[in-house]
Amino acid sequence: MNIVLFLGYLSILFAGGAIIAKIAKKIGIPDIPLLLIFGLILSILNVIPKNIVESSFDFIGNFGLIILLFIGSFEMEWNIMKRVLDVIIKLDILALLIVWIISGIVFNFVFHLPILSLIGLLFGAIVSATDPATLIPIFSSMDIDPEVAITLEAESVFNDPLGIVVTLICLSALGLAKAENPILEFFSLAVGGIILGVIAGKFYEIIISKIKFEDYIAPFTLGLAIAFWYFAEGIFPSITGYEISGFMAVAIMGLYIGNVIVHKKEHKKDMEKVAVFMDELSIFIRILIFVLLGASISIPLLEKYALPAFLCALGSILLARPVGVLIATAIPPIRPLTERIYLALEGPRGVVPATLAAMVYTEIMKHPNIVPKNIASLMPPTELAGTILVATFMTIIVSVVLEASWAKPLANILLKRKTSTS
């Protein structure tokens, strides 16, 4: 790759993305839709070649998710979160599974596939993870019950790695990834990731108690998070044949550091440096992921699949999410119905679906022969990759626009009594 051209592309992504994000902030809307559209414009003008976009996602996707999951869990307040922990668990397990299945069924129905085809279920898995972080600026300007806000934010932090786990299982079932036993695979990915995350947090605490990193604490923290991710995704599978979710491990590590080590006086300054560094880095990553997702979509692809993709998006947003949340939160102890409805209507998709869709699209387009013949007979590999990419793009942009628009009016209607007394 020509290094001069590569740096030129980066300048367009960062400078252009920053301007777009600033415009979004100025007019009071989430930056995701505008960043996606900016990427789409770059695609139309062929500013950045498709092969550069596609080859970038493997690195940017994995590296970006490590940073975003770490900082998201690092900033979670356990004292508030534990008051709604039962709701978070219901949303992150039962609701996520229901959203996955229903979104997949809708996709299969729209594209005339067998109702339980793994192709649709792969789409459902990709869009099952939420990203209410896009609503934080809106929540900050609202008189909203902090328990509702923390529920949505914590749900996202922990269903992000679970969404990745479910996607990996679907890829395994499709023959696009290796798995000996899907049930055991889920257990080793999710539970193994949690255990490894706690070990990582404890190990980090021991190291920084013995060595004063001072100005180098932030790169050490990032390096150790990546090291544990690598152990989970690379070393452990080569030894045992089973994977641990490195993303889950990173999220739990961040939660431990942000709620245990942060409160220790001797580490307070170091943790402030870590928070600032990760926050700044996450801005770069968000810009890259959303602009590159938009840039990966060609106009012919969008024209061909826009309408069915829009229907898939509506099915996931207005059917799968509400049904999943209302069923999951019907398990006692039951929260007020108005609060449950609000949670059901606020689950915008974001970074994780964007990254997963782009990575799946890139892998299939590079190696179409990896798609098994029984799957390719239902939908050709290039069409499979294209439909999932465009449907995910549409789900992200529609969910963010709709749910950011109605977040405040719905809160005034559904949560009025609770917020007025809090």
From Swiss-Prot:
Topology within the bilayer = Multi-pass membrane protein
Q: Which GO terms of the cellular component aspect does the record hold?
A: plasma membrane
GO molecular function term, any single one: potassium:proton antiporter activity
Query: What UniProt keywords apply to this chain's record, in alphabetical order?
Result: Antiport, Cell membrane, Ion transport, Membrane, Sodium, Sodium transport, Transmembrane, Transmembrane helix, Transport
Which chain regions cross the lipid bilayer?
Answer: 3-23, 28-48, 52-72, 93-113, 119-139, 157-177, 183-203, 216-236, 242-262, 281-301, 307-327, 341-361, 384-404
**Record family assignment:** Belongs to the monovalent cation:proton antiporter 1 (CPA1) transporter (TC 2.A.36) family.
Tell me what this protein is called.
Probable Na(+)/H(+) antiporter 2
**Which species is the source of this protein?**
Methanocaldococcus jannaschii (strain ATCC 43067 / DSM 2661 / JAL-1 / JCM 10045 / NBRC 100440)
